[in-house]
Amino acid sequence: MADFDTYDDRAYSSFGGGRGSRGSAGGHGSRSQKELPTEPPYTAYVGNLPFNTVQGDIDAIFKDLSIRSVRLVRDKDTDKFKGFCYVEFDEVDSLKEALTYDGALLGDRSLRVDIAEGRKQDKGGFGFRKGGPDDRGMGGSRESRGGWDSRDDFNSGYRDDFLGGRGGSRPGDRRAGPPMGSRFRDGPPLRGSNMDFREPTEEERAQRPRLQLKPRTVATPLNQVANPNSAIFGGARPREEVVQKEQE
């Protein structure tokens, strides 16, 4: 079992970079501090995202950090983005820095950023399984580098109150290595009824930093599903039809 370091040795203060203060009066209420992992995967839960979020938006939010992979979580039935994602970083320092974005405003939404957690299996170790490409858009092998399983329970203290929307996905590791090792259950973390979350007041919203995302350079997302009604052969005709016309 890996050793952990706590991140309570740092003051998470707001500044113009779009970060929020952890545990402040305008935040998400009191949370028990989690431990930072000392070995991969270094994965953060990012919640309360707009429903039209795509991968490029996540890259822009954490543009100064070393991102390894991004997974936007979708509804299994509708394939719609559920409003949260998992971001794996190359090193623990980037994960630690990402936690300072908790409470930052993106539009009219207050971001939720926390350490993603998995559940240890009964036989020891963190479970994983081998398989083909993820059917939710992760790409690459589904084998876990860090041994996390998407069906494992985890506990980051958030409710699954996200519905609908459209989002993008990441094709895989941006450095041609294994994709994000963390395969978490398609649902945000849950906590007991003592969770003290409230929406910030208008006065608190006015005092919090805002993240500014530039307009997308590509009008149509790269991962948009192709039109099923489009012609398979384009402007060309099947060979049988061409031969028949020549004979006439």
Curated annotation (Swiss-Prot):
Any one of the GO CC terms: perinuclear region of cytoplasm
Subcellular compartments: Cytoplasm, Perinuclear region
Primary location group: cytoplasm
InterPro entries, alphabetized: eIF4H_RRM (IPR034229), Nucleotide-bd_a/b_plait_sf (IPR012677), RBD_domain_sf (IPR035979), RRM_dom (IPR000504)
CDD domains: RRM_eIF4H
SUPFAM superfamilies hit by this protein: RNA-binding domain, RBD
RRM domain sequence ranges: 42-118
Extent of Basic and acidic residues compositional bias: 131-163, 196-207, 237-248
Disordered: region residues: 1-41, 122-248
Modified residues (Phosphoserine): 13-14, 21, 24, 32, 230
Ranges of compositional bias, category Gly residues: 15-29
Superkingdom field: Eukaryota
Free-text function comment from the UniProt entry: Stimulates the RNA helicase activity of EIF4A in the translation initiation complex. Binds weakly mRNA.
Protein name: Eukaryotic translation initiation factor 4H
